[in-house]
A protein has these predicted regions:
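A generic structural motif
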Residues: 11, 138, 251-253
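Cofactor-binding loop segments of dinucleotide-utilizing enzymes, especially the Rossmann-like FAD-
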Residues: 12, 58, 101, 231, ...
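Short, catalytically relevant binding-site loops at active-site mouths
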Residues: 103-105, 143, 202-204
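A short, hydrophobic/aromatic-rich structural module that often spans a beta strand
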Residues: 106-116, 207-216
Length: 277
């Protein structure tokens, strides 16, 4: 048994003990005992190469009456520890990577899940004097999203990763149409040289999927749909037809669900209308 590689875990909302209910204050450690016994501490740091990795527990469990509720924040104990850890960070570190379960920042303020982390900037203030790039790794939302954190005093990017279970194991797709997958990062020193999804279904589907069969617009004209996930406002999209660039006037951005995702969930009888990412 066991994994053939060393694994570092980050606790999430489904890792807490549901039998522990009605937690008051910011100490939810009673709901974490089983996790700690099996997998280890809920927050810690490790140095690998030129990167300082800091793993946090930003799922503050409340579980009122067994409703699985939680807040997205760091408790004071972790915040105090983070300051001490930063004080002892090796001088040759070239990048800080923060890992936690719930995203701290969202590109879409109207997204249905979750609320932004209310003390994320307080944590980042601890690292700003290091003058190092900060990368945040998160999950939870079952989508792929990249957010450049709006701070003028430091460079911070948060990557919210798709998950291996997709949209809860119904099919190997996440809510935004991204494949159910994990993400591989390659480093050279403190530089991220490549970030690539390990797509089990189609290795060519890295950031988009094309739908080009039987689709028509409101006027009845044939259209091609292109779903791009994990996009960033700095990206440049270029579409070509028979080798020729398609004029921008023929392209239109829309906010709709991925066609494949809708088909799968319709077949399962699931209502997805309430979910917004």
């Amino acid at each position: 048994g066991g994994m053939p590689i060393q694994t570092f875990h980050a606790i999430g909302n489904h890792d807490h003990d549901m039998a522990v209910q009605n937690i008051a204050g910011d100490d939810d450690s009673a709901a974490e005992l089983a996790y700690i016994s099996a997998l280890g501490p809920t927050y810690y740091a490790v140095n690998i190469g030129k990167v300082h990795y800091v793993v946090f527990d930003n799922t503050q469990y409340v579980n009122t009456g067994g409703d699985r509720s939680f807040a997205v924040r760091l408790n004071r104990r972790q915040m105090d520890w983070a300051q001490k850890d930063a004080d002892y960070m090796p001088s040759d570190v070239e990048r800080i990577v923060i890992a936690w379960h719930c995203p701290a920042f969202r590109r879409n303020p109207g997204a249905s899940s979750p609320n932004p982390m209310d003390n994320a900037d307080e944590l980042l203030d601890i690292y700003k004097d290091k003058q190092l790039p900060v990368t945040i790794w998160s999950g939870h939302n079952h989508i792929a999203e990249t957010v450049t954190v709006p701070r003028s005093d430091m460079s911070v990017t948060e990557y919210t990763h798709p998950c291996v279970c997709g949209a809860w194991w119904y099919f190997p797709l996440c809510h935004d149409g991204a494949p159910a997958t994990f993400t591989r990062y390659d480093f050279s020193g403190g530089t991220i040289t490549e970030r690539r999804s390990v797509n089990f279904s189609d290795s060519d589907e890295q950031y988009c999927r094309v739908y080009n069969s039987g689709l028509k617009n409101a006027e009845g004209r044939p259209v091609v749909r292109l779903n791009v996930w994990d996009w960033h406002p700095t990206w440049k999209f270029e579409c070509r037809e028979n080798g020729a660039a398609v004029p921008a006037s023929q392209l239109k951005a829309v906010r709709e669900y991925d066609d494949y995702y809708v088909t799968v969930h319709d077949a399962c009888g699931n209502d997805i209308s309430s979910f917004s990412f």
